C-alpha cells in the first residue's frame, strides 16, 4: 500500500493525503518505461523532464513527490522512513513502473535496499563511480548534513567495487539550504558554486544532492565537478530499455 501522503503519477494512481504531488502533464511518452522517480522536492520534476526530453525522448516518466520523507530522514535518520519508502515503491510497482530511480541522496540507500520486485536505482551511484575513476581524492559537498554520510558510504562502496583507494572529505555548505527552501534556486546554486571553487587538493568534487546540479555550470575550478541527475537518469533509462 502507499505511504501516508504519497501519490503516484498516472491516471487513477492518485494517493491519499497531503504533502505529495503526482507527475504533471507531459510526463508520458510513447516509448520505453514507465520509469518512476521518487523525489523529495517538486523542484526536481522539471529538471528530470528536461533531461528526458534532451537525451531520452520517448521514455515515460512517472514522478512521485513525497516531501515529508526528507524532513523525517533529516530529523530522525534515513532508517526511520524505510517502511514509508518501501510503501511508495510498492505503489509505483503496482501502478506499472518497470524501475524506480530515487533522486534523494539522503534516502537513496534505504530505497535501493528495498525488495520492490523491480530495479530500484540511486540517482547518485553513477556519479560516485565517476568520482572514484577520477582519482583517490574526492570531496563531497552537501547542503544538508543528512546527505553527507550516505554519500561518503556510496563513494567508498564504489571504490571497493573498483578496487581503488579513496580518501573522501566532506564540506557542508552552510546556509545554502535556506536559499533552496525559500525557492531561491539561483542563490542556492551560487552558494554551492562558491563552496566548490574553494575546494583544494581534490581529484573530483561531488555535488551530493540532485538539487545542486545547476551549480556545476557556475564553477570555475579546474577540478571536475560532478552532479547526479544526468548520469542517474541515463542509468534508469538503460534499465527500463533493457527490461
Task: Tell me the role of every PLM-derived stretch.
Residues 1-10, 14-243:
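Non-catalytic structural scaffold of enzyme domains
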Amino acid at each position: 500500500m502507499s505511504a501516508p501522503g504519497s501519490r503516484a503519477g498516472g491516471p487513477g494512481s492518485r494517493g491519499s493525503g497531503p504533502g505529495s504531488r503526482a507527475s504533471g502533464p507531459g510526463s508520458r511518452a510513447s516509448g520505453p518505461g514507465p520509469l518512476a522517480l521518487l523525489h523529495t522536492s517538486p523542484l526536481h520534476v522539471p529538471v528530470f523532464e528536461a533531461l528526458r526530453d534532451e537525451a531520452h525522448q520517448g521514455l515515460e516518466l512517472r514522478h512521485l513527490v513525497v516531501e515529508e520523507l526528507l524532513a523525517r530522514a533529516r530529523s530522525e535518520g534515513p532508517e526511520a522512513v524505510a517502511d514509508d519508502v518501501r510503501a511508495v515503491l510498492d505503489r509505483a510497482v503496482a501502478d506499472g513502473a518497470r524501475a524506480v530511480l530515487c533522486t534523494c541522496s539522503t534516502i537513496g540507500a534505504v530505497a535501493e535496499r528495498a525488495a520492490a520486485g523491480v530495479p530500484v536505482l540511486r540517482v547518485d551511484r553513477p556519479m560516485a563511480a565517476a568520482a572514484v575513476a577520477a582519482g583517490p581524492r574526492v570531496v563531497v559537498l552537501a547542503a544538508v548534513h543528512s546527505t553527507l554520510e550516505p554519500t561518503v558510504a556510496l563513494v567508498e562502496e564504489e571504490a571497493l567495487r573498483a578496487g581503488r583507494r579513496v580518501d573522501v572529505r566532506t564540506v557542508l555548505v552552510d546556509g545554502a539550504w535556506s536559499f533552496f527552501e525559500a525557492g531561491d534556486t539561483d542563490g542556492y546554486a551560487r552558494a554551492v558554486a562558491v563552496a566548490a571553487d574553494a575546494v583544494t587538493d581534490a581529484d573530483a568534487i561531488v555535488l551530493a544532492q540532485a538539487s545542486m546540479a545547476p551549480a556545476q555550470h557556475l564553477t570555475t575550478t579546474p577540478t571536475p565537478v560532478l552532479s547526479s541527475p544526468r548520469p542517474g537518469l541515463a542509468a534508469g533509462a538503460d534499465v527500463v530499455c533493457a527490461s
